[in-house]
């Protein structure tokens, strides 16, 4: 649940009955500590000792926890140990700025050097001063909305600035503190210090919570030590926001992760016709070497975003910056956890340095997630557009599809785990329904090829063919409620973010207004051209139906596979969401209540016309009920993958047999070894069963 100033503890409390009727067991809350005013996510904490006032404060939070418990709902709370906001209301940081190294909070933050370098200026200090934008007022340094403390004041403004414990610089420069990724406004903490852990966690650990979700654990100096402290202090469930690569295993004990691994294994079941999709993409943009493309993007962000940080680490390790670049750019996962990857350390230089200075190597490890996230997830995923339903957090774009046997092997390793089965989150590039709809395009490659060519001729955009191709995929995947003005603006915002993240023709640091305007014209042309819209809708209609079938199949896999199903922000019905901030759009709980009320039993019209979302709501409540009623089998029971024909995925959990369509454009028939009851439809089937638009969940009749 995304809590915001416009959706508070009280608002959530007023909807608890809805979650209970839906079949939810636990609420999973976004951060609740005091944050920057107006924040719509809460990861920009300013005070660890206060429950956020804009959400209702401590009294309303306690009341929510009490009401949730009395309703039979547990609460998992998201916490942010890695960083805080650089903000005037962060009084610990303000004390550091005022007192420098004399402040007791100097070691609260991950600082370097003798002064704090604050890159908050819109231009160079000299230019900002010449424009009169900095002044001393009421004993504070005032710049725009900033109010900074002063340790010394003299008659000369430059002299005053030079005598402070901080230095103001342009936003283009790197700060003298470790950040969350490259975000200058989020300063990292030194949780390896026991007193920092106690002070930053003390408030929340006093509340009666069932579990914690730990944000960005890979950014911490020693994640294993941190988790030991957390387990000593907190008896409940601990879930990590740990993004695992394919085959990667967490090297320390934990209850589970937030489930990006499940999302990506499942995602690869739904894509087909790799050769044809590859051929079309190569015709449009030329041949792309994925491996070298990923490395190029990582090298780019190391040079442009993290050069100062990594140069400092290289000096501490006693290696050349180039050696460090080669090593980190080679890694295909977030962090090495103290073990140097020998395959990427080709000359052994990093291994030798790590043996001599493990502390410095761990400092390097704290930057590995930033390089991977910014280089791969926030650059390459916006450059390589072969089939963008695959471009997700934790993905591996060297892979196109997955054989069900590999999915079954993954699932067998998760039996009994509390890891989430996530399919949509605030970090996913697209919501599950968008991904499944785009994946449905892969089932009709020739028709797609023809449409792409036709649409290009109709619009004739003056943009990179790669950006044009992505736009067509985004439009197909996210179109749902018509060519409205709201949708037009959402697409423009998404495409602007896409091209800036790709860092090819424009970027956040160096915007190319002329190119960006051409991309906006492309969006407008698509909306304004009636011939294009007619052609688009001819294609979108059948793809929408196939995408919905795939979404329902994914829903069944999520709920009945090993792990804990995770539902994000209204995804119990159709939610066609784009990259953040679009995926934080508010949820209309009144509409969800109406849908829930209208989907208590299965009717033919819910299947014949799925657009109103009742079928997904019905399937969600039905599958969650099946899970509750068969909890032992679904949670700890044996898992057996079934051998089924291509286009299907099936498995057994105890006495339950689950069969879903991963290929939506055709129907299938499966032979049975007796009589079964379908727990989704209620019908009795024997000898053989058709796998139509709904997943099959079968129990054998004794």
Question: What positions do the PLM features span?
Answer:
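Polyanionic (Asp/Glu-rich) segments that form extended negatively charged tracts
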Residues: 223, 228, 234-236, 265-320, ...
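C-terminal beta-strand-rich structural cap/linker in extracellular carbohydrate-active enzymes
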Residues: 684-702
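Acidic/aromatic-lined carbohydrate-recognition and catalytic surfaces
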Residues: 1-183, 189, 198, 206, ...
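Amphipathic alpha-helical
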Residues: 522-540, 613-639
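Beta-strand-rich binding/interaction modules
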Residues: 631-633, 656, 665-682
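Conserved phosphate/anionic-ligand binding catalytic regions in large, soluble enzymes, centered on
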Residues: 333-335, 418-434, 471-480, 554-582
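Carbohydrate-binding surface patches
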Residues: 615, 625, 641-671
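Extended, charge-enriched "interface" segments that sit outside catalytic cores
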Residues: 346-347, 419-422, 434-544, 552, ...
């Amino acid at each position: 649940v995304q809590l915001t100033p416009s959706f508070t503890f009280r608002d959530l409390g007023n909807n608890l009955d809805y979650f209970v009727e839906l079949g939810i067991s636990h609420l999973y809350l976004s951060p609740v500590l005091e944050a920057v005013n107006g924040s719509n996510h809460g990861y920009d904490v300013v005070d660890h000792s206060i429950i956020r006032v804009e959400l209702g404060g401590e009294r309303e939070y306690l009341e929510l926890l009490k009401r949730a418990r009395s309703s039979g709902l547990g609460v998992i709370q998201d916490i942010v140990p890695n960083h805080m906001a650089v903000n005037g209301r962060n009084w610990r940081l303000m004390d550091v700025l005022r007192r420098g190294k004399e402040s007791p909070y100097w070691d609260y933050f991950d600082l370097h050097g003798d002064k704090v370098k604050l890159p908050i200026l819109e231009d160079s200090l000299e230019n900002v001063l010449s424009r009169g934008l900095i002044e001393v007022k009421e004993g504070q340094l005032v710049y725009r909305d900033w109010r900074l403390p002063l340790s010394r004041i003299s008659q000369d403004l430059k002299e005053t600035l030079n005598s402070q414990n901080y230095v103001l610089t342009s936003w283009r420069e790197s700060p003298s503190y470790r950040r969350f990724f490259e975000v200058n406004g989020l300063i990292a903490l030194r949780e390896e210090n026991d007193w920092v852990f106690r002070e930053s966690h003390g408030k929340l650990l006093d509340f009666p919570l069932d579990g914690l979700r730990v944000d960005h654990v890979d950014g911490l100096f020693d994640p294993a030590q941190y988790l030991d402290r957390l387990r000593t202090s907190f008896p409940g469930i601990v879930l990590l926001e740990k993004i695992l690569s394919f085959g990667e295993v967490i090297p320390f004990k934990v209850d589970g992760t937030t489930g990006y691994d499940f999302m990506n294994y499942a995602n690869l079941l739904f894509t087909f016709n790799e050769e044809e999709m590859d051929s079309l993409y190569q015709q449009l943009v030329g041949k792309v070497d994925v491996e070298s493309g990923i490395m190029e993007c990582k090298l780019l962000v190391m040079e442009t975003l993290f050069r100062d940080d990594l140069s400092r680490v290289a000096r501490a390790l006693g290696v050349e910056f180039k050696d460090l670049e080669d090593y980190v750019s080679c890694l295909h996962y977030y962090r090495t956890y103290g073990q140097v990857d020998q395959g990427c350390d080709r000359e052994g230089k990093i291994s030798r340095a790590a043996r001599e200075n493990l502390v410095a190597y761990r400092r390097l490890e704290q930057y590995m997630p930033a390089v991977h996230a910014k280089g791969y997830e926030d650059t390459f995923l916006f450059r390589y557009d072969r089939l963008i339903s695959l471009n997700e957090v934790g993905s591996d774009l060297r892979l196109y599809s997955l054989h069900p046997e590999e999915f079954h092997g993954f699932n067998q390793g998760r039996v009994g785990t509390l890891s989430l089965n996530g399919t949509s989150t605030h970090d996913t590039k697209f919501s599950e329904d968008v991904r499944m709809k785009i994946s449905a395009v892969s089932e009709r490659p020739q028709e797609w090829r023809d449409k792409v060519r036709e649409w290009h001729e109709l619009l004739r955009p003056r943009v990179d063919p790669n950006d044009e191709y992505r736009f067509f995929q985004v439009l197909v995947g996210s179109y749902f409620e018509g060519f409205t003005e709201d949708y037009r603006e959402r697409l423009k915002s998404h495409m602007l973010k896409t091209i800036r993240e790709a860092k090819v023709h424009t970027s956040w640091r160096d915007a190319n207004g002329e190119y960006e305007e051409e991309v906006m014209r492309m969006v407008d042309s698509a909306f304004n051209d009636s011939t294009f819209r007619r052609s688009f809708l001819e294609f979108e209609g059948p793809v929408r139906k196939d995408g919905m079938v795939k979404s329902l199949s994914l829903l069944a896999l999520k709920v009945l596979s090993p792990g804990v199903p995770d539902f994000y922000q209204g995804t119990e019905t159709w939610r066609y969401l784009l990259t953040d901030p679009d995926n934080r759009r508010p949820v209309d709980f009144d509409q969800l209540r109406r849908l829930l009320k209208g989907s208590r039993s299965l009717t033919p019209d819910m299947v014949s016309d799925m657009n109103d979302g009742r079928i997904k709501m019905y399937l969600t409540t039905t599958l969650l009920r099946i899970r509750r009623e068969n909890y032992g089998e679904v949670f700890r029971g044996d898992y057996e993958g079934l051998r089924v024909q291509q286009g299907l995925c099936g498995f057994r959990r105890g006495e339950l047999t689950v069969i879903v369509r991963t290929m939506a454009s055709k129907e299938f028939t499966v032979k049975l070894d007796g009589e079964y009851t379908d727990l989704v439809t209620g019908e009795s089937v024997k000898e053989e069963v058709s796998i139509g638009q709904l997943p099959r969940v079968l129990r054998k009749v004794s």
